[in-house]
């Protein structure tokens, strides 16, 4: 088995910024891991968090350090013991899941012992700010099922 590994960074602006008690973000820097095998590509991504000692460079280095093993066919089970939990392992794990599903090796519903997925309600977080701005955000997102 031969796989190709690609690691890239992307930067996405956050419209209006996003604020929580720890600070404000104006953009998201994302590390993307892509595994290509027999014309099929699996993709995973992560956001390194300084709070956990992660940087863009440290995450890229951690993923690239697994390059030879991933190219040789490392699977998800091996990955769990080969890399510590964190952003880098998350990106690689997601890429492996995506690759296996797209290659037809896995049916996620069957694998998880579940029926076909159903829509799931999630919360939309209103960015911390001035009361008027928060009220406007809430009004703009009033059709969402759950605001926090």
Description of each model-found segment:
Residues 1-148:
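N-terminal capping/lid subdomain adjacent to the active-site entrance of alpha/beta enzymes
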């Amino acid at each position: 088995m031969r796989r190709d590994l690609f690691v890239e960074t992307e930067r996405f602006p956050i419209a209006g910024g996003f604020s929580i008690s720890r600070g404000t973000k104006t953009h998201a820097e994302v590390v993307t891991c892509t595994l290509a095998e027999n014309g099929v590509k699996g993709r995973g991504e992560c956001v390194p968090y300084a709070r956990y000692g992660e940087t863009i460079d440290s995450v890229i280095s951690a993923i690239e350090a697994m390059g030879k093993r991933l190219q040789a066919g490392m699977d998800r089970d091996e990955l769990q013991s080969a890399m510590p939990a964190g952003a880098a392992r998350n990106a690689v794990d997601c890429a492996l899941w995506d690759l296996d599903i797209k290659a037809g090796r896995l049916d996620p519903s069957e694998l998880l012992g579940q029926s076909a997925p159903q829509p799931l309600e999630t919360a939309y977080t209103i960015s911390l700010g001035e009361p008027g701005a928060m009220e406007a955000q809430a009004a703009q997102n009033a059709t969402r099922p759950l605001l926090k």
